[in-house]
Amino acid sequence: MREIIKKLEERIDLDNQIMTDAVNQIMSGEVEDPMIEDFLIKLNAKGITENEISSAAQVMRSKSLSIDLGNGAHVDTCGTGGTGLNIFNCSTAASFVAAAGGAQITKHGNKGVSSKSGSADLLMIAGANINHDRNHLKEILNEVGFIFLFAPLHHQAMKFVMPARQRIGKKTIFNLLGPHTNPCNAKRQILGVYDKGLLKTFGNVSNLLKMHHVLVVHGNDGLDEISITDKTFVTELKDGNLNQFEIQPEDFGLSRANITALEAETPEESLELINAAFEGKESPVQDMISLNAGASLYLSSASNSIKEGVSLAKELLNNGKAKQTFSSYIEMTNSL
């Protein structure tokens, strides 16, 4: 490890084998905390490459408690978080709408770190049990079309890096890995990023990880979602090809809104906004859910375009099917 850190001090990028060896040692508990800290700080200082991210993600995947779902069209909606903006749990709400429309959603997530309400916080406040084993998760997915993959249960080797990360107190490569380490090995994903500079990077990393269809998104307002308040920058990976473009609410017949209409200070407030949208109340919250659910429906091939997906999402929100999917998930997680 000392030799690897010396390379970082000399600003030498790590090749796949060296990066794999380094992260494997760290996530096997073979490296002392001060050296992990040194490695992470010096990797940051050098600048993290796409190859380094993909190599580390592959190690993290290999260490996870995985669930084999074959090569189905299931979609992850896990993004980076880290925006510092406290809005309702859009990606979680959108996941249930997409599931109601026939998509299979394997959402990877955690409790809030930079936000006050992470996906796990919301689901627990709603009454869901998120601590299921792999067999039960398969059963829930087959029945409801949605499962939540609580990161601490599936990535137990992360305990070896937590002390060093906490001492550093800033983003490290591990803040970039979560969205690339779905325990079900999802090949399709809507992946929100906190920084516009990560759009192409994450598109290329997704390609290195042999993803099939990914939308990497960043709102001009700073959100790691498709935004209702402003244009959204998109990098689409499909069948090995990258395409970059912009979309805006008007493209889908929706009006722009102020970000204050999306704000939620607590998981309870977030749930209140989502429940109102699921009851059919038209609002910027409902529009934003529709935008992001539409993207997941497109990724899952349940619709032929994001626009078609947004129309279907609106229908599912207003006819009660999204609400029913949400209720069914909560009920089933408590009955197993």
Ranges and model annotations:
Residues 1-12, 77-85:
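N-terminal basic/disordered segments at the start of proteins
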Residues 1-2, 19, 36, 53, ...:
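A general structural signal for well-ordered alpha-helical segments in protein cores
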Residues 7, 62-65, 87, 102, ...:
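Glycine-rich anion-binding loops and their surrounding alpha/beta cores
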Residues 8-54, 62-70, 288-289:
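N-terminal glycine-rich anion-binding loops that anchor highly charged ligand groups
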Residues 15, 32, 49, 104, ...:
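Helix N-cap / loop-to-helix initiation motif
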Residues 40, 88-144:
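A glycine-rich phosphate/pyrophosphate-binding beta-strand-loop-alpha-helix module
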Residues 41-45, 96-100, 295-301:
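Short glycine/serine- and small hydrophobic-enriched flexible loop segments
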Residues 47-113:
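Active-site cofactor/substrate anionic-group-binding motifs, chiefly glycine-
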